[in-house]
């Protein structure tokens, strides 16, 4: 039980900070969608941030996971492994960044954003900083320095949010003479209205640059070195992980990269393809609540389960953790899907027509989270080639799904393709895992909760309640009822867990050897 508590504690710490930070960041969605009322204005942001995520996987080469694995096996070599992995990332990142900065005008024309060369360059610098700081962040997780990790992330989010508000609201209003006329000469010096949505990239870049100061202790002891035998060992382990990560990114980002190009012109009356991409990209952010739960769990789970690799009780622990992970994610799926009428107010009016994609995206993320849990079998057994195979299959499903469904269903086709890919990956991973690393998962429980939640969401969406004073209490009551049903079903487990928790809180008897 102590191991379970440790994982829960770390997940809570990473989770509260990650959720709070991302919610602060999500507060920018109404700022951005109201400031840029035409969805096409944010189309390039949606697409370029997808490329940033793609490049980050290529730059880091899966070395974060390799660092976890080798640091857990040989803790005494952690400083050397840290230097080796970070040195590799620095070399790759430096070369790629120079190329991107040089080719930025050509890339802007190729992406059909010819006037946004500076946006490309800022994006290149953003991904460079993210890549270089990824290994120091991994070091904090390996060394169980969650508070330092959290502090750096929170300060970064605060800076990015503040700079967005400063550029997009304050500078814009002062420049246009709405208030504080005495500051207009200063604002004219730093603010150019032609940049517009580009200030989102600039704010991100300036916030990320602060990481080098915030993580200065995590860089301690780093020496640039290229120990080729060690690097080869790290690379051979990490390369399949990188391909897995790349396929995962393709699964998550193909929709935003394909939508503008595969959507027939005029598919949505009165909207351009750029408008459709802007709508999809902003509505997609409402699935952030599920992604946050998954990300928070993974921050704690990766180093935790690697440290338990040789423990004979690891399969049973993984099964229990996965069961409760699914329960929490199901409650998030229900809570968000039933309250889209309220959550939709967070985005500008012209963006709300895409809210129908959110329940499917949430379900896709739920299955993706289950897959990440199941995937520990090939990481713990050093059979990462299976992870590559599974995610490549998922990527193919995503690519083909978007190519065929976008022309027929528009951005709803993107959501369906993502869900299909996540389900396929989860099923394949489970079947292979049962052969190579059996884990006693409670499959009946998982399918029951997901099916029941899906039926509830579908039924509630068929009931149109235009009055929010009736709709909101009704939806909250349905959510509460769902939580109560789960509590009744799991009452024995909850009662046992509560009893163990209370016992663990009692002080040890005087004279006890414990």
Model-derived features: where do they sit?
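Specific pore-lining/lateral-gate transmembrane helices of multi-pass inner-membrane transport
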Residues: 72-88, 279-391
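Membrane-water interface segments that mark the loop-to-transmembrane alpha-helix transition
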Residues: 9-21, 48, 60-105, 114, ...
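Hydrophobic alpha-helical transmembrane segments
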Residues: 121, 151-220, 244, 392-398, ...
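Membrane-proximal transmembrane or re-entrant/amphipathic helices at the cytosolic face
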Residues: 461-514
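Interhelical loop/hinge segments that connect adjacent transmembrane helices in multipass membrane
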Residues: 1-7, 175-199, 210-252, 300, ...
